[in-house]
């Protein structure tokens, strides 16, 4: 019997974005084989999380490491056509192990004042009270719990 393969690490940013009505942006996973049909906070895959930390650690950055392309926040704003006020919060990293993948998820939170509905894809603004009507996979539940722990427990909403 072949030895069990170690899950491949994947690094993702979960963008937890709230509108002025207190609803959160969720998207239905339509195309992935993994977790198809579940609703999720927008996720952006990155190579790893070390790039950002390295920039903060060293004031002088070598020429070739300057251009990482758009940040996850910039990618999100382009993909969803929203102007987001990103919050400067440090959330606990979320980890979730599937049989063949290990997700490392960093939460990035933001708020929008001007928002729109999405006609072209399965994206909705949903209040936390309604979350139970939408199937969430376990990693998304962990993301929401991590968000609540840090953000809502600090008395902000």
Regions found by a protein language model. Name each.
Residues 1-157:
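Intrinsically disordered, low-complexity, charged terminal extensions of DNA damage-control enzymes
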């Amino acid at each position: 019997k072949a030895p069990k393969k170690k899950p491949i690490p994947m690094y993702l940013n979960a963008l937890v974005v709230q509108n002025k009505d207190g609803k959160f942006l969720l998207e239905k996973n339509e195309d992935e084989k993994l977790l198809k049909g579940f609703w999720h906070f927008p996720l952006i895959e990155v190579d790893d999380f070390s790039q950002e930390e390295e920039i903060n650690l060293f004031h002088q950055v070598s020429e070739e490491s300057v251009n990482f392309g758009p940040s996850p926040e910039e990618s999100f704003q382009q993909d969803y056509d929203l102007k987001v006020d990103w919050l400067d919060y440090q959330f606990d990293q979320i980890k979730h192990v599937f049989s063949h993948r290990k997700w490392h998820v960093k939460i990035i939170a933001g708020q929008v004042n001007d928002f729109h509905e999405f006609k072209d894809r399965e994206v909705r603004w949903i209040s936390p009270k309604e979350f139970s009507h939408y199937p969430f996979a376990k990693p998304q539940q962990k993301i929401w719990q991590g968000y609540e722990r840090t953000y809502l427990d600090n008395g902000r909403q």
